[in-house]
Amino acid sequence: MKLLTLDGFLTVLALLAALYAVLSPVQRIRLSMSWRSQLILAIPACIAILAFELFDINPPSCPSILGGLCRYLELGTADPGVPRKFAFLIAFAWLIGSVFIHRAARPTLRSLPELTQLATTLVDEEQYDDAIRLVEPHLELIAVASCRKSKIQLAHDRLKDFGPVDPQSFAAFTRPRGPGPHPYQGENLPDWAARPVRALARFVPAHKRAEEAASDMLQLLFHSNRLLDHIVDRRPHFGVALARLDVYGSTEFVGRYLTRLIATPASALYQELAGNEISESPIGYQLPERNRLLHFLFADPQNAERLSVWKPIGDYTKRLLAGDERQDYWSYLNGDPGWFENERNSDPVWNAMFFFDIMVTSAARHGIEYHMWLYYLPRFADLLEKGYDSDGSGIDKEAEFPTRAARLLYELVGFLTSWVTLYDRLPQGSRLRLMPDRHDRGSAIPHSAAIALGETLAIVLASERINDGVIQTLHDVTLRAIREIHDDGMR
């Protein structure tokens, strides 16, 4: 066994200091999270090593209870290098313990201010990957701290607000109401009896700094435009992690995030949509976990409903068709659609409609009694009709679809008719098969889709721009869908 000399021990300490100097900011913050535990381990280890090195203290003898094992554990009392050998074993055990503490270290509420400060510095210096690697493992802690939902924060707040409160105060407003078990808050106690309990709050940390730091961190993550650009281009799945946070501001972030994704044909959203066209009979599409964004939003479509994901996709598409996003887009739409099958996976309008298709069918499969704002599609149809122009050079007006805009109208009507015919594919007894008593919009998907289809057909039939052959095709597609629901639908 090698001997650990004093010079060797000092050399090891110098190497550790040098390694710390070249660590990345992310690794340094990870070390700082466990410095207390590391210090508790390092102090006795250093004292023991120095004691064995300087004073040649013999190691403790092997306990007799171990019996025959002692001959393998004892270093040999006659050997003059025994103390140094034992010092080497202590140093080795210290190394193992230090590595374990570092790997097991987790941030705490106390470390959030430092974490936020470093993340802000990294973003300001445009070191976005380092900032994301620093923050991503701790998003849950950040979200909990910002809402004051950690156990220690809840304990402090319950003690501080224990007892009767003014019915008009904010404390009364935040107290849980309704059925279900709720923590006892002493509402019916006299104030003098509740006062000693409230005094206990002084001994429980409030962690206000952690709450403020976590809120600042979320503001940075949700509102930094440069960071959002980097997320969309390089780390799109970090955007999904942020979308999962049920905190104030997440809906606004998801809106900005999805807008950037649909506006960027090479983005992860287009890639996931292109790889998610396999239907899942009888309703909806397969949502493999590799498509992280679509799987998160639509495997449980309540996530899509909570985040109102139809709005950023629908609003961007309306602006695009109105000519407010890309001035050259209508030149493209009024061109020859000969290669549309190959082009559609990069076309924003088609992908927006396909996004709605996945969303609407997933909601129907899960029995969500909401139309998921499929009424965006008649607005798309109206804008497609207003920009429709088949008078360009090289356009065959007698073709089934003279232009790409004509093909998009056909695809749009196809999506609407497929949602109407969900009525036949829904299980018996589904509430989505119920029709409203009055002629209102209602919220069931098949009924809402029928209204949207009627609005779209009215736009098409009244158009003086759309070619007659295209109008006839869309009319026939609509009536065919009606006939599929009612055998006498064509009579």
What name fits each language-model region?
Residues 25-33, 61-63, 96-116:
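Juxtamembrane/interface segments at transmembrane-helix termini
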Residues 4-10, 43, 62-67:
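Globular "head" domains of long coiled-coil molecular machines
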